[in-house]
Structures are given as C-alpha cells and as structure tokens.
Amino acid sequence: MRSYFFNEAKRCSFKSDYHGATAAKVGAVAVFKGTVIAKGYNKNKTHPLQYRYNCHRFDTNSNHYYPSKIHAEMEVVSKIRNLDIDFSKVTIYVYRETKEGTLAMARPCKACTAALKDLGIKTVCYTTENGYCEEKYK
C-alpha cells in the first residue's frame, strides 16, 4: 500500500513548476484511513501559510527577503487543516526527484515540519537518495 501512496506523490511531483536553485520536483499526499485526502506539489506560487511558517527556516532578524513559494507539504496542509478529523491518524507521503530523474531527500523542511506538527500529524514518509524513510513526530 505504501508504494501506491508514494506513486501518487510522484505523480503530483510531475506537476511542479518550481525552477529554483535545486529545481527538484516535489509532490506530497495526505492519507487518512487508507484514502488520499489531499495532494500537493511545490510551485512558484506564493502562499500566506508558507510565509507564516518560513520563520522556522530563516533568521527572522535578517534583512533578506525569502519568497514564500509553497512547498508540496504546505499545500497539503492548506487543503486539510479545516477538516474535522483526527490528524494523528494522517500520514504524509513526500516524493522528491532531481531534474535528472533520480530519487532525492524529501524530508520536510523546518517550516513544513512545524506546520505538520501544529496540525497534529505524527507520521511522515519521504524519499531519500537510497529509497524511503518513515519518521514519527512526538
């Protein structure tokens, strides 16, 4: 079943229009009770939720501007955050692929991790250079 959800996240990653420094394609899906309830991918579009959580990624005293391009995980969070469900039973699957088509580390950044934890999500599965990993949040 896990491979099915990673394949769904992979399909989402192909929609990515992000062309930043890494230009990696990232897709994510949220799964609740065996069903995909939301999909997302990284994009050039900004989002206020990403902007709010970016304080976890960057020095807030810095004068540098970091555009709040939405990450795949944050797009998923924005789609499910108002649902009336037990978020501790939601699993997020994140897939990342380089522009060359090889698997890459897709561990959520500090901003996305904070958003997932704030929502009460406890389990995140993501790609690594060598396969897949599951991480449990406290």
Question: Which residues fall in each region the model found?
Answer:
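Zinc-dependent deaminase catalytic domain
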Residues: 1-138
